[in-house]
Amino acid sequence: MAKVVAIVGPTAVGKTALSLRVAQKFGGEVISGDSMQVYRGLDIGTAKATTEERSLVPHHLIDVKDIHDRFSVADFKVAAEREIDQITDRGHLPLVVGGTGFYLQALVENLALGRDQFDQESAAIRDHWHQIATERGKQFVWEQLNERDPAAAAKIPVANLRRVIRALEVIEKTGALFSTQPQPPAKNDFLIIGLTTQRPVLYQRINQRVDQMVANGLLEEAKWLYDQGGENEQAGKGIGYRELFPHFAGTVSRQEALEKIKLDSRHYAKRQLTWFRNQMTVHWFDLVSQQNTTEEIEALINGWLKK
């Protein structure tokens, strides 16, 4: 069982800087736990580590997919576990860094995602529930799960429609509760470090980060994605891109689109924090207002590695 450090939290709280410091101190390699950083060409809007930063420490699961490819949580789990094994074999410490909650939960808890999810019956069930979600909303679909399997619903946020539908799919296919489905034992030993800060400070930093992304060429990057048909691809669903597509289509102004990016980013950050606090065991730190806590984090990791 490999030891793995995960660094989680919303955007603009210092995950990249901390990951570089920890990797350099403990001989680590970074695995991106972000669902959008796999796409080549989407550098600014996904806040990838820079070329210079990646030259300091090996990074994995960045720039491995074309913008027209899909990349599911099951794909991530398989790829990340492969990287963990290879990094461990090299005698290095795997560091999973990112903010895509369910991707990290699937990896940390070794969730059984099911290899049957691509058969026709499963697809039909999912299509049915997706249609209902479109017509009646995510809350209604979650309530249907709550009626059938309250224990499962208690562990799955309303916003995680894919997971809610997956639970309903398993119930309908097997006739058994999703919450009673056997889960495989943990595959690796994770220490989860969470970064956060006071909400007004976080929101200010998010707004500043969006402004910096625009200065760095976000609109040009999003326009390239739009011209490639990215509006209809998984890659085009990311915050920072989807809000700009209506601007390129001429239906909203540039300023309106940028304000929407900031709003969506703030809302997403709030959801990320809620997810990690409700779904995972995390050691929380605020490096924005208390930078000396970096030493505390290093001491925590050092002690955990010696166990």
Curated annotation (Swiss-Prot):
Residues 34-37 are annotated as: Interaction with substrate tRNA. It comes from the Bacteria. Pfam families: IPPT (PF01715). The record marks T100, R126 as: Interaction with substrate tRNA. This is tRNA dimethylallyltransferase. Catalyzes the transfer of a dimethylallyl group onto the adenine at position 37 in tRNAs that read codons beginning with uridine, leading to the formation of N6-(dimethylallyl)adenosine (i(6)A). One of its GO terms (biological process) is tRNA modification. Keywords: ATP-binding, Magnesium, Nucleotide-binding, Transferase, tRNA processing. It is an enzyme of class 2 (transferase). Belongs to the IPP transferase family. Its cofactor is Mg(2+). Substrate binds at T11, A12, V13, G14, K15, T16. The keyword Metal-binding does not apply. GO terms for molecular function: ATP binding; tRNA dimethylallyltransferase activity. It catalyses: adenosine(37) in tRNA + dimethylallyl diphosphate = N(6)-dimethylallyladenosine(37) in tRNA + diphosphate. Its EC number is 2.5.1.75. Monomer. ATP binds at G9, P10, T11, A12, V13, G14, K15, T16.
